[in-house]
Amino acid sequence: MARTKQTARKSTGGKAPRKQLASKAARKSAPSTGGVKKPHRYKPGTVALREIRRFQKSTELLIRKLPFQRLVREIAQDFKTDLRFQSSAIGALQESVEAYLVSLFEDTNLCAIHAKRVTIQKKDIQLARRLRGERS
């Protein structure tokens, strides 16, 4: 057997295609549903972390103004009817409520981390309030 000279061939850069299994081939040959592309989804937690960073940077109020105002008026009705509020008073209340909630959630998160969890639970909020002396 005589040796022959081998010539260089252009490489495609990939592996040789493998034979498909019968079930895969049947699936691929089945008619597609109009070529509808699935919407892009991020991994669980990615969007949550992005929102956390965004809200930590921002300083604007996160509770909508009108629903908060309705809630304040509804609670005030239990104490005295026909109470009037200045818009600045409602704004000051909303600022303090949001500051309180942010602080409570920070303490709640510390309680969850102490319990070696990353998800806050009702018992974490209860513990945080108890440690603050707000609830006996």
Curated annotation (Swiss-Prot):
Tell me where in this chain the PTM N6,N6,N6-trimethyllysine is found. Answer: 5, 28, 37, 80
How would you describe the post-translational modification of this protein? Phosphorylated to form H3S10ph. H3S10ph promotes subsequent H3K14ac formation and is required for transcriptional activation through TBP recruitment to the promoters.
Q: Where in the sequence is the signal peptide annotated?
A: none
Positions bearing N6-acetyllysine: 10, 15, 19, 24, 28, 37, 57, 65
Region called Disordered, residue ranges: 1-43
Q: Which UniProt keywords apply?
A: Acetylation, Chromosome, DNA-binding, Methylation, Nucleosome core, Nucleus, Phosphoprotein
By sequence similarity, the record places it as follows: Belongs to the histone H3 family.
> Could you describe the subunit structure of this protein?
The nucleosome is a histone octamer containing two molecules each of H2A, H2B, H3 and H4 assembled in one H3-H4 heterotetramer and two H2A-H2B heterodimers. The octamer wraps approximately 147 bp of DNA.
In Swiss-Prot or TrEMBL terms, this protein is called: Histone H3.1/H3.2
* Species in which this protein is naturally found: Scheffersomyces stipitis (strain ATCC 58785 / CBS 6054 / NBRC 10063 / NRRL Y-11545) (Yeast)
